[in-house]
Amino acid sequence: MFMGEYTHTIDDKGRLIIPAKFRSQLGDDFIITRGLDHCLYGYPLIEWQAVQQRLASLPSTNANARKLVRYFYSAACECQFDKQGRVNLPANLMQHAYLERDCVVIGVASHFEIWDAERWASYQDAAASDFDQLAAGFDGLSF
């Protein structure tokens, strides 16, 4: 399970250190792709296969389903770590998430996300002010 929040810096070559706790769960190969809210999603291969199955169940006759699947898959890339635990982020993914230098890597249970640090701070501020209302909106949810 991916948990926690880690601040890192992208170097001039587009390389980002992934937290050691996450690397141990990812294995040698993993997937990074576009995520919602202008962040990046990272998946271990086993979870990526589950995502693929869910996307394959969408009706290909539905234009919005086709658009979603194309947009999601077209940016997906299989990644590996270098010897320092860094991953090279493709330019198109960095552009999607507005990544330049300072970023935050967060755990989200089955996957991890990579956010621009300023965008993450803004997102967190908005979520914090609505946290009680957000939780109340899901009947039967308890912590």
From Swiss-Prot:
Q: Which residues form the signal peptide?
A: none
Name of this chain's protein: Transcriptional regulator MraZ
The record, for InterPro entries, names: MraZ, MraZ_C, MraZ_dom, MraZ_N, MraZ_sf, SpoVT-AbrB_dom, SpoVT-AbrB_sf
Question: Which Pfam families does its entry note?
Answer: MraZ (PF02381)
Please list the residue ranges annotated as the SpoVT-AbrB domain: 5-47, 76-119
Q: Could you give the subunit structure recorded for this chain?
A: Forms oligomers.
**Which keywords label this protein?**
Cytoplasm, DNA-binding, Repeat, Transcription, Transcription regulation
GO (cellular component) term, any one: nucleoid
Cell compartment(s), UniProt? Cytoplasm, Nucleoid
Residues spanning the membrane:
none
Source taxon at top rank: Bacteria
A molecular function (GO) term: DNA-binding transcription factor activity
Homology family:
Belongs to the MraZ family.
Could you state one GO biological process linked to this protein?
negative regulation of DNA-templated transcription initiation
List the CDD domains.
Answer: MraZ_C (cd16321), MraZ_N (cd16320)
